[in-house]
């Protein structure tokens, strides 16, 4: 069977915590249109808190539940609204594609020291220096949990 997917967001999707409610309220309409899969934006807390589009991952387990990065809700809503939206899609046989960025993190809570090398910008395998110590925000403590 061929399905039809909708990407239910774009970079400029309005915030204010309303997207998950919109998805929930439109689930039956989407099914009537023949939609079989819905691609939703990252649901977790990003470094930009309530303004994050989700591609600056801070806490992959905060779906709009904890007071972190200046907000409780994410740009798209809170955990309860998200789970209700996914359940509404499921009830009308629309699958959910969950977008999760796993290969980087942003907005560490504390600094850590570690060694780095200066490298050739055109070839990262070509070291231009001996290792030296730097300090950067790479420690995540999630104090809002």
Spell out what each predicted region is.
Residues 2-25, 32-36, 40-145:
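Substrate-binding/active-site clefts of carbohydrate-active enzymes
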């Amino acid at each position: 069977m061929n399905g039809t997917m909708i990407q239910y967001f774009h970079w400029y999707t309005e915030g204010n915590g309303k997207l998950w409610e919109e998805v929930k309220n439109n689930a039956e309409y989407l099914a009537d249109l023949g939609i079989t899969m819905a691609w939703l934006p990252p649901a977790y807390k990003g470094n930009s808190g309530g303004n994050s589009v989700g591609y600056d991952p801070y806490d992959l387990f905060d779906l709009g539940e904890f007071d972190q990065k200046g907000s409780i809700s994410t740009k798209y809503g809170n955990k309860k609204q998200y789970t209700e939206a996914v359940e509404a899609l499921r009830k009308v046989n629309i699958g959910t594609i969950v977008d999760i960025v796993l290969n980087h993190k942003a907005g560490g809570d504390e600094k850590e020291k570690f060694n780095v090398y200066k490298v050739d910008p055109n070839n990262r395998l070509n070291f231009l220096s001996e290792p030296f110590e730097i300090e950067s925000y790479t420690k995540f403590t999630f104090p809002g949990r």
